[in-house]
Amino acid sequence: MLALNLPPYSFKISNKEGKKYIFDVLRKKYVALTPEEWVRQHFTNYLLVHKGYPSGLLANEIQINLNGTKKRCDTVLYNRDLTARMIVEYKAPDVVITQAVFDQITRYNMVLRVEYLVVTNGINHYAVSYTHLTLPTK
């Protein structure tokens, strides 16, 4: 797999029926090794090992209901009272981060209303501090 702009780590890879799988420490199971999953596992490791977030406050593939449609946030970071604090959206390293990607994560944030949005393809990383504004009352 491609070298990323993230710290390297010792990952667990398995081969089954000609397909590669990588161990997801948050979901505690092997998942298909796709380019996007490669980015997810590296970024998750960065949050856990290098930034010190407890694994109990991170979750992968969190389902939300957006206007009657089921969607999945790639990774959600929670604070200690288990309120969502950050959404991370991953793309494969060869995917260019465009406005459409930010539109996607912003739609997810309409449901979770977090403080921080992160978008990464493993090469380029973007973090946004998000403030939820309300209209003034009379």
Regions found by a protein language model. Name each.
Residues 1-33:
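Interdomain/boundary linker segments immediately adjacent to catalytic/signaling cores
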Residues 2, 56-81:
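Active-site metal-binding core of divalent-cation-utilizing nuclease and nuclease-like domains
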Residues 23-60:
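Acidic-basic catalytic patches of nuclease active cores, encompassing PD-(D/E)XK
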Residues 29-30, 94-95, 133:
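Short, surface-exposed beta-strand-loop junctions and turns on beta-sheet-rich folds
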Residues 50, 80, 111-112, 134:
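Alpha-helix C-cap/termination motif
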Residues 83-87, 91-130:
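Short, charged, amphipathic alpha-helix that recurs within catalytic cores of restriction-modification
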Residues 131-137:
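Conserved small/polar residues in nucleotide/adenosyl-binding loops
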